[in-house]
Amino acid sequence: MKHIINSYEHTNDTARNNSDCPDVVLPEEIFFTISVIGILENLIVLLAVIKNKNLQSPMYFFICSLAISDMLGSLYKILENILIMFRNMGYLKPRGSFESTADDIIDCMFILSLLGSIFSLSVIAADRYITIFHALQYHSIVTMRRTIITLTIIWMFCTGSGITMVIFSHHIPTVLTFTSLFPLMLVFILCLYIHMFLLARSHARKISTLPRTNMKGAMTLTILLGVFIFCWAPFVLHVLLMTFCPNNPYCVCYMSLFQVNGMLIMCNAVIDPFIYAFRSPELRDAFKRMLFCNRY
């Protein structure tokens, strides 16, 4: 986020003498390359679901929602790089009205990426829970109509929240709201996991008769969640430290890894499609048919 970058640069100037940790600077080409790969991979996921009717189910629609979130995160960085390039070439007036508006739009995309990922993973967790413990009623509970309504509400909420957070991005309550959604999502999914574990112990025989794909879907969610936490948690921690201890030498030392934390976010968009392909034979076959022009 541009607001965070600007605040970080200001913090760096005021706290430079309090820390011996130099800033870790990564070439912009690395960010650009990872972002382009992330967009292309997730675009293939979306096209695979759109073109294959056997993949047009609630579970894959939720995966598409996560793929869109990943694409927004990658697109954010590409647009930011283009904006910086135009500004350095003199085509944009520094801190002019156009650049400020473009910054706000790009920041909104970044927030949409995080919020979209959080809620997409949450509905995938709920979907897996229903699949395992209400297998017989699954198709009557999780219908396509309810899936579309749920995703529409999620993205409307994320869009409204993203716009609000950009407008009030310099207020501490906004930062707290932004960062609190991350642990709240983890708590929600953790509660589902604990409940699933307790029910699994009491219904072990019943669960053993479920199709293997049901349990495989739960494992896929676990992997996706683990990658999401690994890639996003360092950035969320950076925002908290920048807000509450900007001049502490230990906090400043951690914040010197800002660009590394940003690269991890970009990597999340690249890793997720590989998880889909590795864990889902149907999606993997769809990828092969698309890449080899239906000759596979």
UniProtKB/Swiss-Prot annotation:
What outcome is recorded for mutants in which this gene has been deleted?
Answer: Most of the MC2R knockout mice die shortly after birth. Adrenal glands are considerably reduced in size compared with those of their WT siblings and they produce aldosterone at reduced levels.
Q: Which residues lie on this side of the membrane: Cytoplasmic?
A: 50-58, 127-147, 200-217, 279-296
Cellular component terms per the entry's GO annotation: plasma membrane
Q: Name the source's superkingdom.
A: Eukaryota
Provide the residues annotated with a glycan attachment (glycosylation): N12, N17
Q: Can you locate the S-palmitoyl cysteine lipid attachment residues?
A: C293
GO BP annotations, alphabetical order: adenylate cyclase-activating G protein-coupled receptor signaling pathway; placenta development
Query: Where in or outside the cell?
Result: Cell membrane
Molecular function per GO: corticotropin receptor activity
- Which membrane topology describes this protein? Multi-pass membrane protein
Query: Which residues are connected by disulfide bridges in this protein?
Result: C21-C253, C245-C251
Keywords, A to Z, come to:
Cell membrane, Disulfide bond, G-protein coupled receptor, Glycoprotein, Lipoprotein, Membrane, Palmitate, Receptor, Transducer, Transmembrane, Transmembrane helix, Ubl conjugation
The answer, when asked if Ubl conjugation is one of the entry's keywords, is: yes
Positions of transmembrane segments = 24-49, 59-79, 105-126, 148-168, 181-199, 218-244, 257-278
Taken from the record's topology, the Extracellular segments are: 1-23, 80-104, 169-180, 245-256
Concerning PTM, the database record says: Ubiquitinated by MGRN1 that may be involved in post-endocytic trafficking and/or degradation of internalized receptor.
Give a short account of what the protein does: Hormone receptor primarily expressed in adrenal cortex that plays a key role in regulating adrenocortical function. Upon corticotropin (ACTH) binding, facilitates the release of adrenal glucocorticoids, including cortisol and corticosterone. In addition, MC2R is required for fetal and neonatal adrenal gland development. Mechanistically, activates adenylate cyclase (cAMP), the MAPK cascade as well as the cAMP-dependent protein kinase A pathway leading to steroidogenic factor 1/NR5A1-mediated transcriptional activation.
The Swiss-Prot or TrEMBL record describes its family as follows:
Belongs to the G-protein coupled receptor 1 family.
Oligomeric and partner information: Homodimer. Interacts with corticotropin (ACTH). Interacts with MRAP; this interaction targets MC2R to the plasma membrane. Interacts with MRAP2; competing with MRAP for binding to MC2R and impairing the binding of corticotropin (ACTH).
Spell out the protein name for this chain: Adrenocorticotropic hormone receptor
> Source species, please?
Mus musculus (Mouse)
